[in-house]
Design a protein with these regions (language model features):
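P-loop NTP-binding core
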Residues: 1-260
């Protein structure tokens, strides 16, 4: 089997539907037969909630980073969950030598059957996000269709560049995703134009449409692919683009096309 590829999914701030993107992208990839591990690296634990993992589930990613558990021991139904204890662990890591390498070292022991790992980064560009970028092969940046979308992506790109230059020279930008956009509005269309003018083909062709259905599916811990298949088609298209930008997934792309 090819080497596992890791994607850090990040945004400059919260509210960009980043966690929904990780949840649904993981689901779409799994349905295409891609063995996918999701990691919740946000102390708020929203991804864990979305996957219906109990808040008291143990061990968590905090235990992995603190050296109390291995990555394999912390997997709950293809997810390594998080809770508020991760905030304490982040503070602890701040005084540790080689703190930026902690997650990469831990994931070196992850089960080899996983072909892809998706990391849901916290909505800040601090130590946990840096750990994710150092552990990752690719970065996927999400942006909401707002006035400051371009500025937020540029700030996230700066952190990606710093991680690449100082700690992870192999890190590549997988793409920029315009998330939760209403393309009927002028500001959504302008946000997409500005992103494409600035970042060109690195912006995914797929735009994720905004809908209250995403909040409903999260509340029910149910994938949007099942809750609203018409909206889920956006994520099937995005998964296809992601696989197209990664080496070694031609067969999975074919399976995904049949799902659509």
């Amino acid at each position: 089997m090819a080497t596992t590829q890791t994607i850090a999914v990040l945004s400059q701030k919260g509210g960009t539907g980043k966690t929904t993107a990780v949840r649904t992208l993981a689901d779409a990839l799994r349905r295409a037969g891609v063995q996918t591990l999701a990691i919740d690296l946000d102390p708020q634990g929203n991804l864990s909630d979305y996957f219906d993992v109990p808040p008291d589930a143990e061990p968590t990613i905090a235990d992995v980073l603190a050296g109390r558990a291995s990555a394999a021991e912390a997997i709950h139904a293809d997810l390594i969950p998080a809770n508020l204890s991760l905030a304490e662990t982040e503070l602890m890591l701040g005084g540790k030598l080689g703190r930026e390498l902690t997650l990469r070292r831990a994931l070196a022991q992850a089960p080899s059957e996983y072909e892809l790992i998706l990391i849901d980064c916290p909505p800040s560009l601090g130590l946990l996000t840096v750990n994710a970028l150092v552990a990752a092969d690719h970065a996927l940046i999400t942006a909401e269709a707002q006035y400051f979308a371009l500025q937020g992506v540029e700030q996230a790109m700066e952190v990606v560049g710093l991680a690449r230059d100082s700690l992870n020279p192999e890190l590549q930008l997988l793409g920029v995703l315009l998330n939760l956009a209403d393309m009927r509005t002028v500001h959504s269309r302008e946000a997409l134009v500005s992103l494409r003018e600035r970042f060109g083909e690195r912006v995914f062709a797929t735009v994720i449409r905004s809908s209250i259905a995403y909040a409903e599916s999260a509340e029910r811990a149910k994938s949007i692919l099942d809750h609203r298949p018409d909206l889920g088609s956006d994520y099937l298209a995005l998964a296809g683009e992601v696989l197209e930008r990664l080496p070694g997934f031609k067969e999975a792309r074919g399976r995904l096309a049949r799902l659509g």
